[in-house]
Amino acid sequence: MLKIILPTIMLLPTALLSPAKSMWTNTTMYSLLIASISLHWLTPSYYPTKTLTLWTGMDQISTPLLVLSCWFLPLMIMASQGHLQHEPHKRKRMFISTLIIIQPFIILAFSATELMLFYISFEATLIPTLILITRWGNQPERLSAGIYLLFYTLISSLPLLVSILYLHTNTGTLHLPIIKLTHPNLPASWTSLLSSLALLMAFMVKAPLYGLHLWLPKAHVEAPIAGSMLLAALLLKLGGYGIMRVTLLMEPVSNFLHYPFLTLALWGALMTSSICLRQTDLKSLIAYSSVSHMGLVIAASMIQTQWSFSGAMILMISHGLTSSLLFCLANTNYERTHSRILILTRGLQPLLPLMSVWWLLANLTNMALPPTTNLMAELTIMVALFNWSSPTIILTGTATLLTASYTLYMLLSTQRGTLPSHITTTPNSNTREHLLMTLHIIPMLTLILKPELISGTPL
């Protein structure tokens, strides 16, 4: 565990002390090295928990997310080079340092076996994200987006702290393996019901559940590209991961608590997919599609069967890769046309023909075309939901149909059509951007061959 955390922390002096010329190269290469070392976590082990220390441990649920978070640091650094090139050197250092500071906290959050440590690292990721959005966003609205992000997350996570303390007074420990072994039965009272609700609520806002999702499109639209990638690929997954961890602790008080959340998540998947069909802003469209996919993850985590957990796990990883790739593609368009409006950036296929290949691949994975892992995940979740209650197939089926519709709408409106007259000169796509897209696509394609690496089954 430490052989990843310590080098990640040492990236900070690397970024601060590197000479101006080689700063980007040093940080990117070093973080890629850390990412490739982290791949060995995926080796299957006989024991349910790998590398168990007093405060961290990894099992089937956290390992894929940990590898994903290590994989995304070099990608975020690579994606940010374009829009930071005109900034003073000191600000570039600050930007890279902010990205690096988030990383140990995310790794701690995914590997913590102690609920209090999990809470602290869960909250600590918020501040650097806020700095990224409010300092490096493009429009003045970034300040209101930052306030939305801060208040939604803080208001929901204060009750989480209280309910963790309540759990501690009742069980005497917050160590997850011990809690799992002892199966503490909380007394069936109003306080335990409220505390289980508070435990769930913080993660529902982070995931986000439909109705509590208003901070997400704002944050995505106003964030710089690294902020969008971080939110889509890692911070939303903290919500899904927290739900998976916490639902196993709250039996049997909260069983009937799951019904409203399940219904709302599935209804939200349907509603946000239909909202996507009416979007004019490209980044906003991708952000709403994230809400729709995470709705399925929440619904699956609420059922708590092996199949549904497995489906939720695969969907979280594949959605992280897909939506991050879509944000990168949207950013390459934005850097050339300086507009996110779909009508003003249409018909780019003749100008950037190779980029349209990436657009096609990203959109096909987003609409869960076979044989992608997105399809495996959606099928697994649908089967689990159908097994639990057959009418859910109406909601999930319609949501899938709408997903395909808005994905095709996004592809056709960005790539096809007549070129707007105001786009006169477009810089060519460069190697860095193609490498960035390739490093998103390679994990997607390799996971098709071996999806059991990410189909975490809670042991």
From Swiss-Prot:
EC number assigned by the record: 7.1.1.2
Keywords: Electron transport, Membrane, Mitochondrion, Mitochondrion inner membrane, NAD, Respiratory chain, Translocase, Transmembrane, Transmembrane helix, Transport, Ubiquinone
GO terms for cellular component: mitochondrial inner membrane; respiratory chain complex I
Main location: mitochondrion
Top-tier EC class: translocase
Membrane topology: Multi-pass membrane protein
InterPro entries xrefs: NADH4_N, NADH_Q_OxRdtase_chainM/4, NADH_UbQ_OxRdtase, ND/Mrp_TM
One Gene Ontology term from the biological process aspect of the record: mitochondrial respiratory chain complex I assembly
Molecular function as annotated in GO: NADH dehydrogenase (ubiquinone) activity; ubiquinone binding
Entry coiled-coil feature ranges: none
Compartments, record wording: Mitochondrion inner membrane
Transmembrane intervals: 28-48, 60-80, 100-120, 147-167, 197-217, 224-244, 256-276, 285-305, 309-329, 341-361, 384-406
Reactions that this protein is recorded to catalyse: a ubiquinone + NADH + 5 H(+)(in) = a ubiquinol + NAD(+) + 4 H(+)(out)
Complex and partners: Core subunit of respiratory chain NADH dehydrogenase (Complex I) which is composed of 45 different subunits.
NCBIfam families cross-referenced by the UniProt entry: NDH_I_M (TIGR01972)
Family named by the database record: Belongs to the complex I subunit 4 family.
Described function: Core subunit of the mitochondrial membrane respiratory chain NADH dehydrogenase (Complex I) which catalyzes electron transfer from NADH through the respiratory chain, using ubiquinone as an electron acceptor. Essential for the catalytic activity and assembly of complex I.
The protein, known as: NADH-ubiquinone oxidoreductase chain 4
Species name: Gallus gallus (Chicken)
